[in-house]
Regions:
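Alpha-helical transmembrane segments and immediately membrane-proximal extracytoplasmic
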Residues: 1-464, 468-469, 473-474, 478-509, ...
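ATP/adenylate-binding site constellation spanning eukaryotic-like Ser/Thr protein kinases
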Residues: 203, 425, 472, 514, ...
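The conserved cystathionine-beta-synthase
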Residues: 478-495, 502, 521-524, 542-569, ...
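Short hydrophobic beta-strand motif reused across regulatory alpha/beta modules
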Residues: 509-517, 576-583
Protein backbone atom coordinates (compact mmCIF):
# COMPACT_ATOMS: atom_id res chain seq x y z
CA UNK A 1 0.00 0.00 0.00
CA UNK A 2 1.38 3.40 -1.03
CA UNK A 3 2.14 5.87 1.74
CA UNK A 4 -0.09 8.92 2.01
CA UNK A 5 1.67 12.13 0.99
CA UNK A 6 2.70 14.42 3.83
CA UNK A 7 1.48 17.96 4.45
CA UNK A 8 4.38 19.54 2.58
CA UNK A 9 3.90 17.24 -0.42
CA UNK A 10 0.19 18.11 -0.49
CA UNK A 11 0.99 21.82 -0.31
CA UNK A 12 3.49 21.55 -3.17
CA UNK A 13 1.02 19.56 -5.26
CA UNK A 14 -1.69 22.18 -4.62
CA UNK A 15 0.72 24.97 -5.57
CA UNK A 16 1.72 23.28 -8.83
CA UNK A 17 -1.95 22.97 -9.74
CA UNK A 18 -3.24 26.41 -8.70
CA UNK A 19 -0.26 28.83 -8.68
CA UNK A 20 2.22 29.31 -11.51
CA UNK A 21 5.95 29.07 -10.78
CA UNK A 22 6.32 32.77 -11.63
CA UNK A 23 3.69 33.76 -9.08
CA UNK A 24 5.16 31.37 -6.52
CA UNK A 25 8.58 32.94 -7.01
CA UNK A 26 7.18 36.35 -6.08
CA UNK A 27 5.46 34.91 -2.99
CA UNK A 28 8.67 33.18 -1.93
CA UNK A 29 10.62 36.41 -2.47
CA UNK A 30 8.39 38.10 0.10
CA UNK A 31 8.75 35.21 2.57
CA UNK A 32 12.53 35.17 2.10
CA UNK A 33 12.74 38.91 2.80
CA UNK A 34 10.68 38.50 5.97
CA UNK A 35 12.69 35.54 7.31
CA UNK A 36 16.05 37.13 6.43
CA UNK A 37 15.16 40.29 8.37
CA UNK A 38 14.10 38.20 11.38
CA UNK A 39 17.39 36.27 11.21
CA UNK A 40 19.33 39.55 11.11
CA UNK A 41 17.37 40.86 14.09
CA UNK A 42 18.10 37.73 16.12
CA UNK A 43 21.81 37.87 15.29
CA UNK A 44 22.16 41.52 16.26
CA UNK A 45 20.16 40.86 19.43
CA UNK A 46 22.45 37.98 20.41
CA UNK A 47 25.58 40.06 19.78
CA UNK A 48 24.23 43.13 21.58
CA UNK A 49 23.01 41.25 24.66
CA UNK A 50 26.26 39.31 25.07
CA UNK A 51 28.40 42.44 24.68
CA UNK A 52 26.24 44.38 27.16
CA UNK A 53 26.46 41.51 29.64
CA UNK A 54 30.24 41.23 29.34
CA UNK A 55 31.51 44.80 28.91
CA UNK A 56 28.90 47.27 30.19
CA UNK A 57 30.65 47.63 33.54
CA UNK A 58 34.11 48.36 32.12
CA UNK A 59 35.74 51.63 33.17
CA UNK A 60 36.58 53.45 29.92
CA UNK A 61 39.68 55.18 31.26
CA UNK A 62 41.68 52.06 32.06
CA UNK A 63 42.58 48.75 30.49
CA UNK A 64 40.76 45.55 31.46
CA UNK A 65 42.37 42.12 31.68
CA UNK A 66 39.07 40.44 30.81
CA UNK A 67 39.76 41.37 27.19
CA UNK A 68 42.39 38.63 27.34
CA UNK A 69 39.78 36.06 28.34
CA UNK A 70 36.50 36.77 26.57
CA UNK A 71 37.59 36.16 22.93
CA UNK A 72 39.15 32.79 23.74
CA UNK A 73 36.01 31.71 25.61
CA UNK A 74 33.84 32.81 22.68
CA UNK A 75 35.89 30.91 20.11
CA UNK A 76 35.91 27.80 22.31
CA UNK A 77 32.11 27.91 22.74
CA UNK A 78 31.67 28.43 19.00
CA UNK A 79 33.95 25.49 18.24
CA UNK A 80 31.95 23.24 20.58
CA UNK A 81 28.68 24.37 18.97
CA UNK A 82 29.96 23.67 15.45
CA UNK A 83 31.57 20.34 16.39
CA UNK A 84 28.76 18.80 18.43
CA UNK A 85 25.60 20.54 17.19
CA UNK A 86 26.16 21.61 13.58
CA UNK A 87 28.75 18.97 12.66
CA UNK A 88 29.56 20.73 9.42
CA UNK A 89 31.82 23.47 8.07
CA UNK A 90 30.02 26.84 8.11
CA UNK A 91 32.98 29.16 7.52
CA UNK A 92 33.42 31.48 4.52
CA UNK A 93 29.70 32.26 4.26
CA UNK A 94 29.61 34.24 1.00
CA UNK A 95 32.17 31.98 -0.67
CA UNK A 96 30.01 29.02 0.34
CA UNK A 97 27.01 30.63 -1.38
CA UNK A 98 29.05 31.22 -4.55
CA UNK A 99 30.21 27.60 -4.44
CA UNK A 100 26.63 26.34 -4.09
CA UNK A 101 25.51 28.40 -7.08
CA UNK A 102 28.41 27.22 -9.23
CA UNK A 103 28.61 23.53 -8.38
CA UNK A 104 25.64 22.36 -6.29
CA UNK A 105 22.67 23.65 -8.29
CA UNK A 106 22.21 26.37 -5.63
CA UNK A 107 21.44 23.78 -2.94
CA UNK A 108 22.41 24.71 0.62
CA UNK A 109 21.89 22.52 3.68
CA UNK A 110 18.94 23.08 5.99
CA UNK A 111 21.06 23.89 9.05
CA UNK A 112 22.54 26.88 7.19
CA UNK A 113 19.19 28.60 7.82
CA UNK A 114 20.12 29.03 11.49
CA UNK A 115 23.55 27.64 12.39
CA UNK A 116 25.57 30.66 11.24
CA UNK A 117 23.33 33.02 13.23
CA UNK A 118 24.05 31.21 16.50
CA UNK A 119 27.75 30.57 15.83
CA UNK A 120 28.58 34.10 14.68
CA UNK A 121 26.45 35.59 17.47
CA UNK A 122 28.58 33.80 20.07
CA UNK A 123 31.84 34.64 18.28
CA UNK A 124 31.15 38.36 17.82
CA UNK A 125 29.43 38.81 21.18
CA UNK A 126 32.52 37.55 22.99
CA UNK A 127 34.77 39.86 20.97
CA UNK A 128 35.61 37.97 17.79
CA UNK A 129 36.89 40.59 15.35
CA UNK A 130 34.67 39.59 12.43
CA UNK A 131 31.40 40.68 10.84
CA UNK A 132 27.84 39.43 11.02
CA UNK A 133 27.06 40.18 7.38
CA UNK A 134 28.52 37.06 5.73
CA UNK A 135 26.73 34.69 8.16
CA UNK A 136 23.46 36.52 7.51
CA UNK A 137 24.02 36.34 3.75
CA UNK A 138 24.58 32.59 4.09
CA UNK A 139 21.45 32.34 6.25
CA UNK A 140 19.29 34.31 3.81
CA UNK A 141 20.63 32.38 0.84
CA UNK A 142 19.99 29.08 2.63
CA UNK A 143 16.41 30.14 3.36
CA UNK A 144 15.92 30.87 -0.34
CA UNK A 145 17.61 27.64 -1.38
CA UNK A 146 15.59 25.42 0.95
CA UNK A 147 12.29 27.04 0.03
CA UNK A 148 13.19 26.51 -3.61
CA UNK A 149 13.97 22.85 -2.95
CA UNK A 150 10.68 22.36 -1.09
CA UNK A 151 8.68 23.79 -4.00
CA UNK A 152 10.82 21.95 -6.59
CA UNK A 153 11.94 25.02 -8.50
CA UNK A 154 14.15 24.69 -11.57
CA UNK A 155 17.86 25.49 -11.58
CA UNK A 156 17.47 29.06 -12.83
CA UNK A 157 14.80 29.90 -10.23
CA UNK A 158 16.95 28.33 -7.51
CA UNK A 159 19.78 30.74 -8.35
CA UNK A 160 17.29 33.60 -8.24
CA UNK A 161 15.92 32.56 -4.82
CA UNK A 162 19.44 32.28 -3.41
CA UNK A 163 20.07 35.78 -4.76
CA UNK A 164 16.84 36.98 -3.11
CA UNK A 165 18.07 35.63 0.22
CA UNK A 166 21.47 37.29 -0.09
CA UNK A 167 20.05 40.64 -1.17
CA UNK A 168 17.44 40.53 1.60
CA UNK A 169 20.16 39.83 4.16
CA UNK A 170 22.20 42.89 3.15
CA UNK A 171 19.11 45.08 2.76
CA UNK A 172 17.76 44.02 6.15
CA UNK A 173 20.94 44.23 8.19
CA UNK A 174 21.88 47.67 6.82
CA UNK A 175 18.35 48.93 5.94
CA UNK A 176 19.70 49.58 2.47
CA UNK A 177 17.52 48.00 -0.27
CA UNK A 178 19.46 49.34 -3.27
CA UNK A 179 22.73 48.11 -1.79
CA UNK A 180 21.16 44.68 -1.31
CA UNK A 181 20.16 44.59 -4.97
CA UNK A 182 23.53 45.62 -6.38
CA UNK A 183 25.38 43.33 -3.93
CA UNK A 184 23.62 40.35 -5.47
CA UNK A 185 24.50 41.51 -8.97
CA UNK A 186 28.15 42.38 -8.26
CA UNK A 187 29.25 39.85 -5.65
CA UNK A 188 27.03 36.82 -6.30
CA UNK A 189 26.98 37.70 -10.03
CA UNK A 190 23.30 36.87 -10.46
CA UNK A 191 22.30 38.14 -13.91
CA UNK A 192 19.79 40.98 -13.92
CA UNK A 193 16.75 40.68 -16.17
CA UNK A 194 13.16 41.77 -15.86
CA UNK A 195 12.34 38.27 -14.65
CA UNK A 196 14.87 38.45 -11.79
CA UNK A 197 14.62 42.15 -10.92
CA UNK A 198 11.14 42.07 -9.39
CA UNK A 199 11.68 39.14 -6.95
CA UNK A 200 14.99 40.61 -5.74
CA UNK A 201 13.40 44.02 -5.23
CA UNK A 202 10.49 42.44 -3.32
CA UNK A 203 12.94 40.64 -1.01
CA UNK A 204 15.01 43.80 -0.45
CA UNK A 205 12.05 46.06 0.29
CA UNK A 206 10.39 43.45 2.53
CA UNK A 207 13.58 42.88 4.53
CA UNK A 208 14.17 46.62 4.90
CA UNK A 209 10.61 47.33 6.07
CA UNK A 210 10.60 44.54 8.63
CA UNK A 211 14.05 45.61 9.87
CA UNK A 212 12.63 49.07 10.58
CA UNK A 213 9.75 47.42 12.45
CA UNK A 214 12.02 45.13 14.48
CA UNK A 215 15.03 47.39 15.08
CA UNK A 216 13.68 50.92 14.79
CA UNK A 217 14.68 53.70 12.44
CA UNK A 218 18.18 54.32 13.80
CA UNK A 219 20.89 53.86 11.17
CA UNK A 220 23.89 51.62 11.75
CA UNK A 221 26.24 54.59 11.25
CA UNK A 222 25.55 58.04 12.66
CA UNK A 223 26.68 60.66 10.13
CA UNK A 224 25.63 64.24 9.50
CA UNK A 225 27.12 66.11 6.58
CA UNK A 226 28.45 69.42 7.90
CA UNK A 227 31.07 70.13 5.23
CA UNK A 228 29.75 69.73 1.65
CA UNK A 229 32.04 68.42 -1.04
CA UNK A 230 34.05 70.94 -3.05
CA UNK A 231 35.68 70.54 -6.45
CA UNK A 232 39.18 71.40 -5.25
CA UNK A 233 39.17 68.19 -3.17
CA UNK A 234 39.20 65.97 -6.26
CA UNK A 235 43.00 65.30 -6.07
CA UNK A 236 42.62 64.18 -2.44
CA UNK A 237 39.72 61.88 -3.44
CA UNK A 238 41.81 60.32 -6.21
CA UNK A 239 44.74 59.72 -3.85
CA UNK A 240 42.40 58.30 -1.20
CA UNK A 241 41.03 55.87 -3.81
CA UNK A 242 44.53 54.69 -4.71
CA UNK A 243 45.38 54.40 -1.00
CA UNK A 244 42.21 52.35 -0.40
CA UNK A 245 43.17 50.09 -3.31
CA UNK A 246 46.50 49.28 -1.69
CA UNK A 247 44.88 48.84 1.73
CA UNK A 248 42.45 46.39 0.09
CA UNK A 249 45.35 44.53 -1.50
CA UNK A 250 47.09 44.30 1.88
CA UNK A 251 43.87 43.04 3.46
CA UNK A 252 43.35 40.32 0.84
CA UNK A 253 46.97 39.16 0.74
CA UNK A 254 47.33 39.12 4.52
CA UNK A 255 44.03 37.26 4.94
CA UNK A 256 45.11 34.67 2.38
CA UNK A 257 48.48 34.17 4.06
CA UNK A 258 46.93 33.83 7.52
CA UNK A 259 44.31 31.38 6.25
CA UNK A 260 47.09 29.28 4.76
CA UNK A 261 48.94 29.30 8.07
CA UNK A 262 45.91 28.20 10.10
CA UNK A 263 45.08 25.56 7.47
CA UNK A 264 48.41 23.90 8.31
CA UNK A 265 47.17 23.49 11.90
CA UNK A 266 43.97 21.74 10.81
CA UNK A 267 45.06 18.44 12.37
CA UNK A 268 45.70 20.15 15.72
CA UNK A 269 42.40 21.90 16.58
CA UNK A 270 43.27 22.74 20.18
CA UNK A 271 46.66 24.15 19.20
CA UNK A 272 44.94 26.20 16.52
CA UNK A 273 42.30 27.43 18.97
CA UNK A 274 44.85 28.34 21.64
CA UNK A 275 47.29 30.01 19.23
CA UNK A 276 44.63 32.00 17.40
CA UNK A 277 42.85 32.87 20.62
CA UNK A 278 46.02 34.24 22.19
CA UNK A 279 46.74 36.39 19.13
CA UNK A 280 43.18 37.72 19.07
CA UNK A 281 42.98 38.38 22.81
CA UNK A 282 46.36 40.12 22.85
CA UNK A 283 45.39 42.40 19.98
CA UNK A 284 42.02 43.26 21.57
CA UNK A 285 43.72 43.97 24.90
CA UNK A 286 46.11 46.40 23.19
CA UNK A 287 43.49 47.85 20.83
CA UNK A 288 39.95 47.39 22.25
CA UNK A 289 38.50 48.96 19.08
CA UNK A 290 39.07 45.52 17.53
CA UNK A 291 36.47 43.98 19.88
CA UNK A 292 33.55 42.61 17.85
CA UNK A 293 32.49 44.36 14.67
CA UNK A 294 33.98 47.65 15.81
CA UNK A 295 31.19 49.82 14.44
CA UNK A 296 31.01 51.90 17.64
CA UNK A 297 34.59 53.09 17.06
CA UNK A 298 33.79 53.93 13.43
CA UNK A 299 30.78 55.96 14.59
CA UNK A 300 33.02 58.01 16.88
CA UNK A 301 35.30 58.80 13.94
CA UNK A 302 32.25 59.86 11.91
CA UNK A 303 30.99 62.37 14.47
CA UNK A 304 34.00 63.09 16.71
CA UNK A 305 35.29 66.64 17.06
CA UNK A 306 37.05 67.00 20.45
CA UNK A 307 39.89 65.34 22.34
CA UNK A 308 37.29 63.68 24.56
CA UNK A 309 35.84 62.03 21.45
CA UNK A 310 39.26 60.77 20.39
CA UNK A 311 39.83 59.38 23.88
CA UNK A 312 36.60 57.41 23.45
CA UNK A 313 38.07 55.78 20.34
CA UNK A 314 40.98 54.64 22.50
CA UNK A 315 38.89 53.73 25.57
CA UNK A 316 39.98 50.74 27.69
CA UNK A 317 43.42 50.88 26.05
CA UNK A 318 46.86 51.97 27.21
CA UNK A 319 46.50 54.91 24.79
CA UNK A 320 43.53 56.42 26.66
CA UNK A 321 44.15 60.02 27.73
CA UNK A 322 46.90 60.52 25.15
CA UNK A 323 44.99 62.08 22.26
CA UNK A 324 48.29 63.18 20.72
CA UNK A 325 48.85 59.49 19.90
CA UNK A 326 45.56 59.19 17.99
CA UNK A 327 47.20 58.92 14.55
CA UNK A 328 49.54 56.19 15.80
CA UNK A 329 46.62 54.32 17.37
CA UNK A 330 44.50 54.59 14.21
CA UNK A 331 47.39 53.37 12.06
CA UNK A 332 48.13 50.39 14.32
CA UNK A 333 44.47 49.39 14.48
CA UNK A 334 44.20 49.58 10.68
CA UNK A 335 47.30 47.40 10.34
CA UNK A 336 46.34 44.78 12.95
CA UNK A 337 42.63 44.38 12.16
CA UNK A 338 43.35 41.83 9.43
CA UNK A 339 45.30 39.65 11.88
CA UNK A 340 42.51 39.87 14.46
CA UNK A 341 39.97 38.82 11.82
CA UNK A 342 42.16 35.98 10.56
CA UNK A 343 42.85 34.75 14.08
CA UNK A 344 39.13 34.75 14.88
CA UNK A 345 38.12 32.63 11.90
CA UNK A 346 41.31 30.59 11.75
CA UNK A 347 41.08 29.43 15.36
CA UNK A 348 37.47 28.25 15.09
CA UNK A 349 35.27 31.33 15.25
CA UNK A 350 32.52 32.16 12.78
CA UNK A 351 32.18 35.48 10.98
CA UNK A 352 32.78 37.35 7.77
CA UNK A 353 35.10 39.91 6.23
CA UNK A 354 32.33 42.35 5.22
CA UNK A 355 32.40 44.33 8.48
CA UNK A 356 36.21 44.21 8.77
CA UNK A 357 36.49 45.77 5.31
CA UNK A 358 34.15 48.60 6.40
CA UNK A 359 36.06 48.99 9.67
CA UNK A 360 39.49 49.10 8.02
CA UNK A 361 38.16 51.46 5.36
CA UNK A 362 36.80 53.88 7.94
CA UNK A 363 40.02 53.90 9.95
CA UNK A 364 42.16 54.14 6.79
CA UNK A 365 40.09 57.08 5.50
CA UNK A 366 40.42 58.92 8.81
CA UNK A 367 44.17 58.16 8.93
CA UNK A 368 44.61 59.52 5.38
CA UNK A 369 42.68 62.72 6.11
CA UNK A 370 44.41 63.39 9.45
CA UNK A 371 47.89 62.95 7.90
CA UNK A 372 46.86 65.14 4.94
CA UNK A 373 45.68 67.94 7.23
CA UNK A 374 48.58 67.69 9.70
CA UNK A 375 51.19 68.07 6.96
CA UNK A 376 49.00 70.42 4.88
CA UNK A 377 49.43 68.42 1.69
CA UNK A 378 46.68 70.44 0.01
CA UNK A 379 43.37 72.08 0.77
CA UNK A 380 41.70 71.14 4.04
CA UNK A 381 39.69 67.91 3.82
CA UNK A 382 36.99 66.98 6.38
CA UNK A 383 38.05 63.86 8.25
CA UNK A 384 34.49 62.64 8.79
CA UNK A 385 33.73 62.72 5.06
CA UNK A 386 36.94 60.90 4.22
CA UNK A 387 36.22 58.29 6.89
CA UNK A 388 33.00 57.59 5.05
CA UNK A 389 34.67 57.52 1.64
CA UNK A 390 37.40 55.24 2.97
CA UNK A 391 34.74 52.72 4.00
CA UNK A 392 33.37 52.69 0.45
CA UNK A 393 36.85 52.55 -1.08
CA UNK A 394 38.17 49.56 0.86
CA UNK A 395 34.88 47.67 0.52
CA UNK A 396 35.03 48.23 -3.24
CA UNK A 397 38.60 46.97 -3.42
CA UNK A 398 38.06 43.89 -1.27
CA UNK A 399 34.78 42.89 -2.92
CA UNK A 400 35.38 44.29 -6.42
CA UNK A 401 31.93 45.84 -6.03
CA UNK A 402 31.97 49.61 -6.62
CA UNK A 403 28.20 50.03 -6.84
CA UNK A 404 27.74 48.16 -3.56
CA UNK A 405 30.30 50.40 -1.89
CA UNK A 406 28.73 53.59 -3.24
CA UNK A 407 25.09 52.78 -2.54
CA UNK A 408 25.65 51.06 0.80
CA UNK A 409 27.55 53.99 2.29
CA UNK A 410 25.15 56.51 0.78
CA UNK A 411 22.08 54.66 2.10
CA UNK A 412 23.60 53.94 5.50
CA UNK A 413 24.43 57.54 6.25
CA UNK A 414 22.06 59.51 4.08
CA UNK A 415 25.21 60.93 2.51
CA UNK A 416 23.87 61.21 -1.02
CA UNK A 417 25.50 64.64 -1.24
CA UNK A 418 28.83 62.78 -1.36
CA UNK A 419 27.88 60.70 -4.39
CA UNK A 420 30.52 62.23 -6.69
CA UNK A 421 33.48 61.80 -4.29
CA UNK A 422 32.25 58.30 -3.38
CA UNK A 423 32.30 57.41 -7.07
CA UNK A 424 35.79 58.86 -7.54
CA UNK A 425 37.20 56.96 -4.56
CA UNK A 426 35.54 53.65 -5.52
CA UNK A 427 36.65 53.87 -9.15
CA UNK A 428 40.26 54.63 -8.22
CA UNK A 429 40.28 51.89 -5.58
CA UNK A 430 38.98 49.29 -8.04
CA UNK A 431 41.41 50.37 -10.77
CA UNK A 432 44.30 50.09 -8.33
CA UNK A 433 43.55 46.65 -6.91
CA UNK A 434 42.56 45.25 -10.32
CA UNK A 435 46.19 45.57 -11.35
CA UNK A 436 47.10 42.96 -8.72
CA UNK A 437 43.91 40.94 -8.09
CA UNK A 438 41.28 40.21 -10.74
CA UNK A 439 38.77 38.67 -8.31
CA UNK A 440 37.12 39.63 -5.04
CA UNK A 441 38.12 38.08 -1.73
CA UNK A 442 35.03 35.85 -1.97
CA UNK A 443 35.57 34.72 -5.56
CA UNK A 444 39.33 34.22 -5.38
CA UNK A 445 39.25 30.66 -4.02
CA UNK A 446 36.61 29.49 -6.51
CA UNK A 447 38.31 31.21 -9.44
CA UNK A 448 41.52 29.28 -8.73
CA UNK A 449 39.52 26.03 -8.85
CA UNK A 450 37.60 27.03 -12.00
CA UNK A 451 34.29 26.94 -10.10
CA UNK A 452 33.34 30.60 -10.24
CA UNK A 453 30.09 31.66 -11.90
CA UNK A 454 30.46 35.01 -13.71
CA UNK A 455 28.39 37.37 -15.85
CA UNK A 456 30.23 36.03 -18.93
CA UNK A 457 27.51 33.73 -20.28
CA UNK A 458 29.91 31.29 -22.00
CA UNK A 459 32.09 30.86 -18.91
CA UNK A 460 29.02 30.69 -16.66
CA UNK A 461 27.51 27.92 -18.81
CA UNK A 462 30.76 25.91 -18.65
CA UNK A 463 30.91 26.32 -14.86
CA UNK A 464 27.29 25.26 -14.40
CA UNK A 465 27.68 22.07 -16.45
CA UNK A 466 29.55 20.06 -13.87
CA UNK A 467 31.51 16.90 -14.58
CA UNK A 468 28.75 14.52 -13.51
CA UNK A 469 26.23 15.98 -15.96
CA UNK A 470 28.30 14.97 -18.99
CA UNK A 471 30.08 11.75 -17.94
CA UNK A 472 28.78 8.67 -19.76
CA UNK A 473 29.18 5.14 -18.39
CA UNK A 474 27.87 2.89 -21.17
CA UNK A 475 31.29 1.52 -22.09
CA UNK A 476 32.66 -2.02 -22.51
CA UNK A 477 36.05 -2.39 -20.82
CA UNK A 478 38.38 -5.12 -22.05
CA UNK A 479 41.37 -6.88 -20.52
CA UNK A 480 44.85 -6.28 -21.97
CA UNK A 481 45.31 -10.07 -22.32
CA UNK A 482 42.11 -10.58 -24.33
CA UNK A 483 42.80 -12.32 -27.67
CA UNK A 484 41.97 -10.41 -30.82
CA UNK A 485 39.26 -12.93 -31.73
CA UNK A 486 37.27 -12.14 -28.58
CA UNK A 487 37.97 -8.44 -29.07
CA UNK A 488 36.01 -8.61 -32.33
CA UNK A 489 32.90 -9.82 -30.48
CA UNK A 490 33.28 -7.01 -27.90
CA UNK A 491 33.50 -4.49 -30.74
CA UNK A 492 30.28 -5.82 -32.23
CA UNK A 493 28.47 -5.16 -28.91
CA UNK A 494 29.83 -1.64 -28.43
CA UNK A 495 27.95 1.49 -29.44
CA UNK A 496 31.11 3.60 -29.35
CA UNK A 497 34.14 3.78 -31.60
CA UNK A 498 36.54 2.95 -28.78
CA UNK A 499 36.96 0.37 -26.01
CA UNK A 500 38.81 1.18 -22.77
CA UNK A 501 41.51 -1.26 -21.70
CA UNK A 502 41.65 -1.79 -17.92
CA UNK A 503 43.42 -4.17 -15.53
CA UNK A 504 41.73 -6.22 -12.80
CA UNK A 505 41.64 -3.17 -10.48
CA UNK A 506 39.86 -1.11 -13.12
CA UNK A 507 42.87 1.12 -13.79
CA UNK A 508 42.90 2.54 -17.31
CA UNK A 509 45.82 1.20 -19.36
CA UNK A 510 44.88 2.45 -22.82
CA UNK A 511 42.12 2.36 -25.43
CA UNK A 512 41.24 0.38 -28.52
CA UNK A 513 40.41 2.82 -31.31
CA UNK A 514 38.00 0.87 -33.50
CA UNK A 515 38.70 3.11 -36.49
CA UNK A 516 42.41 2.18 -36.26
CA UNK A 517 41.91 -1.63 -36.13
CA UNK A 518 39.02 -1.83 -38.57
CA UNK A 519 41.28 -2.99 -41.41
CA UNK A 520 42.42 -6.12 -39.52
CA UNK A 521 39.41 -7.23 -37.48
CA UNK A 522 38.04 -9.35 -40.34
CA UNK A 523 41.30 -11.23 -40.85
CA UNK A 524 40.54 -14.38 -38.88
CA UNK A 525 44.09 -15.73 -39.25
CA UNK A 526 45.21 -12.94 -36.86
CA UNK A 527 42.66 -13.69 -34.14
CA UNK A 528 45.04 -15.81 -32.05
CA UNK A 529 48.23 -14.00 -32.99
CA UNK A 530 47.49 -10.65 -31.35
CA UNK A 531 46.21 -9.57 -27.95
CA UNK A 532 44.57 -6.32 -26.88
CA UNK A 533 47.73 -4.98 -25.23
CA UNK A 534 49.47 -5.13 -28.63
CA UNK A 535 46.70 -3.17 -30.32
CA UNK A 536 45.83 -0.58 -27.70
CA UNK A 537 46.86 3.07 -27.86
CA UNK A 538 47.29 5.73 -25.23
CA UNK A 539 44.40 8.23 -25.21
CA UNK A 540 45.25 11.68 -26.52
CA UNK A 541 44.31 13.06 -23.08
CA UNK A 542 42.88 11.79 -19.80
CA UNK A 543 40.39 13.71 -17.66
CA UNK A 544 40.26 13.72 -13.86
CA UNK A 545 36.84 13.22 -12.27
CA UNK A 546 37.32 16.53 -10.39
CA UNK A 547 38.75 18.50 -13.31
CA UNK A 548 37.32 22.01 -13.85
CA UNK A 549 35.06 22.14 -16.88
CA UNK A 550 37.18 24.91 -18.41
CA UNK A 551 40.08 22.45 -18.54
CA UNK A 552 37.83 19.75 -19.99
CA UNK A 553 36.80 22.06 -22.83
CA UNK A 554 40.42 23.07 -23.37
CA UNK A 555 41.58 19.44 -23.70
CA UNK A 556 38.88 18.70 -26.26
CA UNK A 557 39.95 21.74 -28.27
CA UNK A 558 43.63 20.78 -28.09
CA UNK A 559 43.18 17.08 -28.96
CA UNK A 560 40.18 17.29 -31.29
CA UNK A 561 39.14 13.95 -29.76
CA UNK A 562 35.64 12.51 -30.10
CA UNK A 563 35.77 10.98 -26.60
CA UNK A 564 38.09 11.27 -23.62
CA UNK A 565 38.23 8.88 -20.64
CA UNK A 566 37.60 10.05 -17.06
CA UNK A 567 39.60 8.55 -14.18
CA UNK A 568 39.79 9.09 -10.43
CA UNK A 569 42.88 9.95 -8.41
CA UNK A 570 44.04 6.30 -8.55
CA UNK A 571 43.63 6.05 -12.31
CA UNK A 572 40.48 3.90 -12.09
CA UNK A 573 38.18 4.44 -15.06
CA UNK A 574 34.94 6.23 -14.12
CA UNK A 575 33.47 6.78 -17.57
CA UNK A 576 34.06 8.96 -20.58
CA UNK A 577 32.95 12.28 -22.02
CA UNK A 578 31.95 12.57 -25.64
CA UNK A 579 32.39 15.79 -27.57
CA UNK A 580 28.81 15.50 -28.87
CA UNK A 581 27.22 15.32 -25.41
CA UNK A 582 29.54 17.97 -23.99
CA UNK A 583 28.59 20.60 -26.54
CA UNK A 584 24.93 19.58 -26.54
CA UNK A 585 24.75 20.13 -22.77
CA UNK A 586 26.63 23.41 -23.12
CA UNK A 587 24.22 24.73 -25.77
CA UNK A 588 21.21 23.73 -23.64
CA UNK A 589 22.53 25.59 -20.59
CA UNK A 590 23.27 28.70 -22.67
CA UNK A 591 19.72 28.56 -24.05
CA UNK A 592 18.27 28.20 -20.53
CA UNK A 593 20.33 31.11 -19.23
CA UNK A 594 19.37 33.32 -22.17
CA UNK A 595 15.64 32.68 -21.77
CA UNK A 596 13.67 35.23 -19.76
Amino acid sequence: MAEKPGAIAKMVAWQKEHISDRQMTLILAFVIGLLASVAGFFLHSIVHEIQILLTSGFEKSTYNLLFLLFPIVGIYLTSLFIKYVVRDNISHGITRVLYAISTKQSKLKGHNCWSSVVASGITIGFGGSVGAEAPIVLTGSAIGSNLGQIFRMDKKTMILLVGCGASAAIAGIFKAPIAGLVFTLEVLMVDLSMASLLPILISCVTATCFSYILMGEKSLFDFTLTDPWELDRVPACILLGVFCGFVSLYFMRAMSACEGFFAQLKQYPYVKLLFGGIILSSLIFLFPSLYGEGYSAVNILLKGRTEADWDMVMSNSLFYGHSQLLVLYIGLVTFTKVFATSATNGSGGCGGTFAPSLFIGGFAGFFFARIWNIYKLGVYIPEQNFTLMGMAGVMTGVMHAPLTGIFLIAELTGGYQLFIPLMIVCICSLLTISIFESHSIYALRLAREGKLLTHHIDKAAITLMGMQSVVEKDYHPVSPDLPMGKLVSEISRSNNNFLPVVNQAGVLLGIIDITRVRHIIFRSELYTRFKVKQLMLQPSAVLSDHEPMQEVMKKFDETDAAQLPVVDVNGVLKGYISRTRLYSTYRQIVADMSAE
